[in-house]
Amino acid sequence: NSPGEQEDKCYTLMRGLVEIHNDSFVDDTNESLGNIEWRKVDLYYSNKMGDKLVKKVESVAYSKNTSLERIIVEQLIKGPGDSTMNSTLPSDLKLLSISVSDGICYVNLSSSFLTEMVNVTSEIPVYSIVNSLCSLGNISGVKIMINGDSAKSYRESISLENVLKFNSEVISS
């Protein structure tokens, strides 16, 4: 690669990345920087014991073409980037689709949500997603689907058939 080609690649890469507080990045190569908005959000990760959620406030960047709900779930998949907290979701989990209708957020995840285990109690991964999304204010409940199917249960203990609401009992006090 010539220096000019390297500069072009570097410029293209830098143009597409917006740095977020905790040194994680959102790849947004199709958007001009003028369309980026910032918002503080509550993300719920696991405590070190894996039995409670811990709130982490982060500033996230998102574009008008990428929903804030999508950014939140993608950040949860990336993990906390903080040694005092643990991830709640498998790192290879894919968010297949996400939408909001009448205050309900519909989250469609890949099957690794059910098959890949993280070292936390059963309600932690589910309520990490639910509590983080419900904290936005415009979402009253979350419906989790696996490959489009909602007739599933998580670790045989939490039914995903119903809309789930914010759960304060799983938050560390």
Description of each model-found segment:
Residues N1-S173:
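Bimodal "functional hotspot" detector
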